[in-house]
Design a protein with these regions (language model features):
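Glycine-rich, acidic and aromatic/proline-enriched surface loops and short helix-turn segments
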Residues: 240-247, 446-457
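Replace the tail clause
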Residues: 1-427, 431-434, 578-680
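Long, polar/charge-rich, low-hydrophobicity segments
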Residues: 291, 311-316, 458-485, 490-646
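Tandem alpha-helical RNA-recognition repeat domains
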Residues: 220, 224, 283, 287, ...
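Extended, hydrophobic alpha-helical segments in both membrane/secreted and soluble proteins
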Residues: 50-57, 254, 275-278, 428, ...
Length: 680
């Protein structure tokens, strides 16, 4: 089918936008062409925000955007703009916040926003059915009413625009002139998490259940500091997710969230950002746990999740694709959520030996009532396998995975996002450190090398700048705060896995970009750079969501790099960030867990441990330092380490030497492992 006239999406990098390129709707990507057209024609804008793995986005597209009669109304009354929220999180953040303010409801996707030509929203919603149902108005009847409101209520819209601008401005926290949050604030964070903890099933709140990686990270850190309840909460949650259906028991990797409180039935989309963060968490949990069976489960989760990434998500260039769709074709050729992942017992029985079927049925719940829409079975760990059954279960999983591979696969969103690749690379690096897997570290390095080679580009002024996304030969969109913050954090982790001078240089360049392009005068960092296009609001977000707060991670990473290099400017910038968000952290430290951890390292700076020696001799030191040390930075410098900054420069001697540094003071050289462990 040829491209429809007026639809401008076919050349976009986003698979989500490309999915709508053949709609009868005259879609435009967000940009000056569409915005100018709205102003010139005095038409309202219909802004539709979603992403390719979103189930309800597909439903609304099929019901409304593929319908010629609906499209005709949209084209008559509106300038229609389609946005991929993964490529344009800046736009998504603004209008999700506006939707929450205007409707007093939480947002989500698809997000449907009607804007004035000046980009101010005047009516918002999420999914709208074609005809009225679910207590929602029908899209067909809604469109002309919303268009008429724009033309007939100009005075009301002007007043509403001013009120919204003022409300958005109030979301920027008022900075303090000092950091008054303290150890009591960190204890309050635990109290807030504990109050919302599900002691029966792990995790926080009720259904739907999300992994909340930033919360678990904070609990793991507090567990290391002797908080036993925090340890129990973190490990119970990790174990419950590993046993649940939110984790793909057959193919590895985690789905976005669980629709039930027991973690058993997921929303089936698989997102890179979840899996990258969870790799780090399960590696940390493995180090912290003292339970042999628990450690074995965490190790298996890490290995299987990385295998899934390599098998289904890795690009030929070494970067990692974004997501897998929740929907796929079932045996009848119908697009259904979860079709790729669910089973029928008869199908399983035909694929396995009798002994394998008995074990798999018992362990994965195939011998129980159907748990997915009352007609299919989704595997979860109903019963842990006995020791003698583990090999049978592994062989059953291998056969089921092979059979699953013959099904129609979920759609792959194959764009490369800098921020998500950074999260994945950190997870790979942490796993490589913990499990002594140099091949996983190499995967992390290749991911970062891709970012440095393809997404770190010279601009018109001849300066390097980071870009947000790539697909094929096209690299575009100025990178956001999260891209820079997550990448800097990842580079610091990689330096601990295997020191490379190119990574240290890149870390310094990204840190300078953060300070030069994102820092606010009052402290903290804007989500968009100083060179970014002007939108109706410039966000400065302290709170963690599915991904951690860019402000929190930037603050942690700048502090850590500042201590490694002895660079006061980085430490001062981090302090200004904590001052900027001081009131927010004191009021809701659990809601901004990443900033709370930054506060913890501000109050008690991390210990830098420098180890210099030949690679072969450093191995025993690495093994001895395998415990969980979240407040330490370990830098191993073998004979290949070159171009060292002054703070790390040490002579290479015949035996390994170590130094423990706090602030600007380092210990005398330590020449044996027991002495080092004693001083830690």
């Amino acid at each position: 089918m040829s491209k429809l006239p007026g639809n401008k999406l076919a050349e976009e990098t986003s698979p989500y936008l490309q999915q709508h390129a053949q709609n009868p709707v005259e879609w435009y990507p967000w940009g000056e062409q569409a915005l100018t057209l709205a102003r010139e024609q005095n038409k309202p804008i219909l802004l539709s925000i979603g992403y390719s793995a979103c189930h309800w986005c597909h439903v609304m597209a099929h019901e409304s955007f593929e319908d010629a009669s609906i499209a005709a109304v949209m084209n008559q009354h509106f300038i229609n703009i389609k946005v991929d929220r993964e490529e344009r999180p800046d736009i998504d953040q603004i209008y999700q916040t506006a939707h929450s303010m205007m409707s007093q409801r939480s947002g989500g996707w698809p997000l449907t926003v009607f804007l004035t030509p000046q980009q101010t929203p005047y009516f918002t919603g999420t999914y709208f059915p074609k005809t009225a149902r679910y207590q929602l108005p029908g899209f067909a009847e809604l469109l002309p009413r919303v268009a008429a409101y724009f033309h007939e209520r100009k005075d009301e819209l002007a007043t509403q625009s001013v009120q919204l601008a003022e409300a958005l401005a109030r979301t920027i926290p008022v900075a303090n002139h000092l950091v008054s949050a303290n150890e009591n604030t960190i204890r309050l964070a635990f109290d807030q998490l504990e109050a919302n903890f599900d002691y029966t099933h792990g995790g926080f709140g009720t259904a739907p259940k999300f992994p909340n990686p930033a919360d678990i990270t904070l609990l793991l850190h507090q567990a290391h500091d002797g908080n036993k309840p925090a340890e129990e909460m973190a490990l119970q949650t990790l174990s419950a997710m590993a046993a649940g259906g939110i984790y793909d028991q057959i193919g590895g990797g985690f789905c976005r969230y669980s629709v039930d409180e027991r973690w058993n039935i997921p929303h089936f989309e698989k997102m890179l950002y979840d899996n990258g963060q969870l790799l780090s968490l399960y590696a940390d949990g493995y180090q912290l746990s003292r339970n042999k069976e628990e450690k074995a489960v965490y190790a298996q989760v890490v290995a299987e999740t990385i295998a899934w990434m390599q098998r289904e998500m890795l690009s030929a260039q070494g970067a990692i694709h974004s997501s897998l769709d929740a929907d796929s074709l079932d045996v009848h050729g119908h697009s259904e959520e979860g079709a790729f992942y669910v089973w029928q017992p008869a199908e399983v029985k035909a694929l396995l030996s009798p002994a394998e079927f008995v074990v798999a049925s018992r362990c994965f719940g195939f011998d129980r009532a159907p748990n997915f829409e009352s007609q299919a079975w989704h595997a979860y760990m109903a019963v842990m396998p006995e020791v003698q059954d583990q090999l049978l279960l592994q062989s059953a999983k291998a056969k089921l995975l092979e059979a699953q591979g013959l099904r129609t696969r979920p759609g792959l969103d194959d764009k490369i996002l800098t921020s998500w690749n950074a999260l994945a690379a950190k997870g790979l690096a942490r796993a490589g450190i913990v499990f002594e897997r140099s091949d996983w570290v190499v995967l992390a390095q290749k991911t970062v090398d891709f970012i440095r080679e393809y997404l770190w580009v010279k601009n018109a002024a001849g300066n390097f700048q980071l870009m947000a996304t790539a697909k094929g030969e096209k690299v575009h969109l100025n990178a956001y705060l999260d891209d820079h913050a997550f990448l800097l954090d990842t580079l610091i982790t990689l330096l601990q896995a295997s020191y490379r001078s190119v990574d240290m240089q890149f870390a310094e360049e990204i840190a300078e970009a953060l300070l030069g392009n994102f820092e606010a005068e009052s402290g903290g960092f804007y989500f968009t750079s100083h060179q970014h296009e002007q939108l109706i609001h410039r966000a400065k977000q302290p709170y963690d969501n599915a991904t951690p707060s860019g402000n929190g991670i930037a603050t942690v990473a700048l502090q850590r790099l500042g201590h490694i290099l002895g660079e006061a400017r980085y430490l001062q910038s981090a302090e200004r960030s904590l001052q900027a968000f001081d009131n927010v952290i004191k009021k809701n430290p659990a809601g901004c867990a990443s900033l709370t951890y930054a506060l913890q390292e501000y109050l008690n700076p991390p210990t830098l441990v420098i180890l210099r020696g030949e690679a072969a001799k450093l191995t025993s030191w690495r093994i001895a330092l395998k415990n969980y040390y979240p407040h330490h930075i370990f830098i191993y410098l073998d004979e290949s380490a070159d171009k060292l900054p002054g703070t790390l420069r040490r002579n290479l001697l015949s035996n390994v030497n170590g130094w423990i540094c706090k602030g600007v003071v380092c210990s005398k050289a330590i020449t044996d492992i027991p002495s080092l462990l004693t001083q830690l």
